[in-house]
């Protein structure tokens, strides 16, 4: 074996071996316990970033560990290949999205291989291929036939620049997240999947997910937003229809002093016919985008419609206002306002001088002071006629019952969750498999015309989708009648909602899933990805699993047993102010820094001499130019070093601060491991270990080895605290480096220890461990080696540390056999130089002995 650790030589050799031997390819094997380890599939943006590397390293560590436990481990990878960035890049680079995407996939695949991830490449899939999306199209047509898909006109956030619909989350401060253009509201027909039909199950089954982070489950609970309340109908004077509102607080109903409707509500539209102020307000609202986060903070505005509704219980007339905080697509498009007990209603009423009527007493039983704000806490009713004196629950039920009896109220369960709009007006996505016949009939694309293939050889103008721009593309014939294909494409969350299941049978040609394979591998045992996917992807992922279950394809209720959300990767960020006052961000790689004695950055400049402002650690991003290229790091230090640093620098679910000094530290550690194995193997063959012939020191070292195995096993397997596992291995390495290597049993013990260390490090740093395992003459390839098992007998402490005091002052610490008597301990203590010195010529008056812990000799 060569003396120096040269990762660039060994890593490519080991990777070639894995490729040729197809080491990580697996098939169903009923005789073995399966383990399905999955990291969220990447978008092929062109290059891997450190966030990817962290995600996939965690996955690979878990997969390799489970494999060493003897399980049949599936770890696949693929590409979430549709999406808007490809269109932008294609326009910029004067190409089409398909070649750009496939080039990126090829490049990033090499990067993944360079990092040594143990993927089953035979299962690789790209979601932009017809072989993949054809099954999604087929499934969609089946959902349509089941009544779970429908088309309706809905108001969307429209970016006039990108010519596309934006999700609420993609609108930042009223502007498009990509191009910063002001967003408009537009009504267009769209396809929806009825996720609301599964709302209760999606909510209740969160309780089954014991190994998902509570934060994610809470976010999903809030997103689904189940509430119990009452739907109340109001008559409106001089208006043909009634108004219906939903409230979760019927106990406050006697304090309702006005109603508010959305600008798009038919009542507001009718009132605007002869009210120019209202018409202008409706126009303004139409172009204001409303994401919920902004709804809470934006200025509340409204205009009186002039209509009066009649309070069903008091008979009072109350005004109906059009307001910008009511959304047509949420609930009924109308709300009842109780300004005394709802802060938003209070602010609106105060602004426009509307009546504020308190109906709930303060906690101390007094009338509430509403001069500054609403009283939003629940309490006892007053000012409420027959309901006075009732507490919240009693009032809720009494008022709900009365409204129901009168025929103007109905108890309802409501959800915040909306149906999933899956239409996108983009080109680079899977075509939606629906057609419109000449006579206006809308129907699913017939099976014999699936897949509806997206043409890849197109010219992008950056504005109109090529399949919308080409009238010929949409033309088809169905049942002998001319028909037009849908030119919208699927939301790309569709592809990522079921890919995990297709990995179990990627070549299956008879349908979406081969149930036998799917039910062998599913559910996923651990799913690893960022918490930013908590509500969108992870909710659709769960929803799709239930849809596939109800179609008879899978037999489990949930797609993944455990979810691990890795933390973000942070790096130093620097900028200098340019001539026009703009910030120019400088890569941390190019910053020349001065640090104080605590290692903190106090001064920085770049090669051109600009004084740099240091803004601290922040998430690696293009905008701050503080991303570190993983490829550069792998070329400099080797993949094993990068992987080890990633797993050691911080717990997997916490943020990780990228520090090159830490990477260098990881590299030094691997060099030490290499050196120790080199020095050990250079001495030739090793005798068998005879555990009965070991000295006390050898037994103590062997105890450390096996205690480390036990700790690392628990840290990786149960606790998933990978950083503490690595720390324990490092600690053991320090002891091994100091251990004697002259005697036959010293070397036999070192052999046992190194074989254990190399196997424990293998999930983290597989290339160096593959090589060292061969040098240590381990059996077969380390990829098929079993995880080391701690020897219980070796861990039994046969000696213990006793503190020796003279007159209460510590004079020595001695190691004695566990079963030593007090006499033997006193005798052993007397042999210590310092103890003997303080006992010389004095009488021991009293002995205090705590067995196995303390010996205190009181002398006088």
Swiss-Prot record:
It comes from the Bacteria. The keyword Protein biosynthesis applies. A motif ('KMSKS' region) lies at residues 619-623. GO terms for molecular function: aminoacyl-tRNA deacylase activity; ATP binding; leucine-tRNA ligase activity. GO terms for biological process: leucyl-tRNA aminoacylation. It holds the Pfam family tRNA-synt_1g. It is found in: Cytoplasm. One of its GO terms (cellular component) is cytosol. This is Leucine--tRNA ligase.
């Amino acid at each position: 074996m060569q003396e120096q650790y040269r990762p660039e030589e060994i890593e490519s050799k080991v990777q070639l071996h894995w490729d040729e031997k197809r080491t990580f390819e697996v098939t169903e094997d009923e005789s073995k316990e399966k383990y399905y380890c999955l990291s969220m599939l990447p978008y092929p943006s062109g290059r891997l970033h450190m966030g990817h590397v962290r995600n996939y390293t965690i996955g690979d560590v878990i997969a390799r560990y489970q494999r060493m436990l003897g399980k049949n481990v599936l770890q696949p990878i693929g590409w979430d290949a549709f999406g808007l960035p490809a269109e932008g890049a294609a326009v910029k680079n004067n190409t089409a999205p398909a070649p750009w995407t496939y080039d990126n996939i090829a490049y990033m695949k090499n990067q993944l291989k360079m990092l040594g991830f143990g993927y089953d490449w035979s299962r690789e899939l790209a979601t932009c291929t017809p072989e993949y999306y054809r099954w999604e199209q087929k499934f969609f047509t089946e959902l349509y036939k089941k009544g779970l898909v429908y088309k309706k006109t809905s108001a969307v956030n429209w970016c006039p620049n990108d010519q596309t619909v934006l999700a609420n989350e993609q609108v930042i401060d009223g502007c498009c997240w990509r191009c910063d253009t002001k967003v408009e509201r537009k009504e267009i027909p769209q396809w929806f999947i009825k996720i609301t039909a599964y709302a209760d199950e999606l909510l209740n089954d969160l309780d089954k997910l014991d190994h998902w982070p509570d934060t994610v489950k809470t976010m999903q609970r809030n997103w689904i937003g189940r509430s119990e309340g009452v739907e109340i109908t109001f008559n409106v004077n001089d208006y043909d229809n009634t108004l219906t509102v939903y409230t979760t607080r019927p106990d406050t109903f006697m304090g309702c002093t006005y109603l508010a409707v959305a600008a798009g509500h038919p009542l507001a539209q009718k009132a605007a016919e002869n009210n120019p102020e209202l018409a202008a307000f409706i126009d303004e609202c139409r172009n204001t985008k409303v994401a919920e986060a902004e709804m809470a903070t934006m200025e509340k505005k409204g205009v009186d419609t002039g209509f009066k509704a009649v309070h069903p219980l008091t008979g009072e007339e109350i005004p109906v206002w059009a307001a910008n905080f009511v959304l047509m697509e949420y609930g009924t498009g109308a709300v009842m306002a109780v300004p005394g007990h709802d802060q938003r209603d209070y602010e609106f009423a105060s602004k426009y001088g509307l009546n504020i009527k308190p109906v709930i007493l303060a906690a101390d039983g007094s009338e509430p002071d509403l001069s500054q704000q609403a009283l939003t806490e629940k309490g006892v009713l007053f000012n409420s006629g027959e309901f006075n004196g009732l507490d919240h629950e009693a009032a809720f039920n009494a008022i709900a019952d009365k409204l129901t009896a009168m025929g103007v109220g109905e108890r309802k369960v409501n959800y915040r969750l909306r149906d999933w709009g899956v239409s996108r007006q983009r080109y680079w996505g899977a075509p939606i498999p629906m057609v419109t016949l000449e006579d206006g009939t809308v129907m699913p694309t017939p099976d014999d015309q699936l897949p509806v293939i997206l043409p890849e050889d197109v010219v992008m103008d950056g504005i109109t989708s090529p399949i919308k721009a080409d009238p010929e593309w949409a033309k088809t014939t169905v049942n002998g009648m001319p028909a037009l294909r849908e030119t919208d494409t699927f939301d790309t969350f569709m592809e990522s909602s079921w890919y995990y299941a297709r990995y179990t049978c990627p070549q299956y040609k008879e349908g979406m899933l081969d149930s036998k394979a799917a039910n062998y591998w599913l559910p996923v045992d651990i799913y690893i990805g960022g918490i930013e996917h908590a509500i969108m992807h992870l909710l659709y992922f769960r929803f799709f699993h239930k849809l596939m279950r109800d179609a008879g394809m899978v037999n489990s209720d949930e797609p993944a047993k455990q979810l691990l959300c890795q933390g973000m990767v942070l790096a130093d960020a620097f900028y200098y102010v340019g001539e026009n006052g703009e910030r120019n961000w400088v890569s941390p790689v190019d910053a020349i820094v001065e640090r104080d004695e605590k290692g903190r950055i106090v001064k920085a400049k770049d090669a051109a001499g600009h004084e740099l402002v240091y803004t601290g650690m922040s998430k690696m991003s293009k905008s701050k130019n503080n991303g570190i290229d993983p490829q550069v790091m792998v070329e400099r230090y080797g993949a094993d070093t990068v992987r080890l640093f990633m797993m050691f620098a911080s717990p997997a679910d916490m943020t990780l601060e990228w520090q090159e000094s830490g990477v260098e530290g990881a590299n030094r550690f691997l060099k030490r491991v290499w050196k120790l194995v080199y020095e050990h193997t250079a001495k030739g063959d090793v005798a068998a270990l005879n555990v009965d012939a070991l000295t006390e020191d050898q037994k103590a070292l062997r105890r450390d080895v096996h205690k480390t195995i036990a700790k690392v096993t628990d840290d990786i397997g149960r606790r998933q605290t990978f950083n503490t596992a690595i720390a324990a291995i490092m600690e053991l390495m320090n002891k091994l480096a100091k251990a004697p290597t002259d005697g036959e049993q010293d070397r036999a013990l070192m052999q046992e220890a190194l074989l254990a260390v190399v196997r424990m490090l293998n999930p983290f740093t597989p290339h160096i461990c593959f090589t060292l395992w061969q040098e240590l003459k381990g059996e077969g390839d380390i990829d098929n080696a079993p995880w080391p098992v701690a020897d219980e007998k070796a861990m039994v402490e046969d000696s213990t540390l006793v503190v020796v005091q003279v007159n209460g002052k510590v004079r020595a610490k001695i190691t004695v056999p566990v079963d030593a008597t007090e006499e033997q301990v006193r005798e052993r203590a007397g042999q210590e130089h310092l103890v003997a010195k303080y006992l010389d010529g004095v009488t021991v008056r009293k002995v205090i002995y705590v067995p196995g812990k303390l010996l205190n000799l009181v002398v006088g």
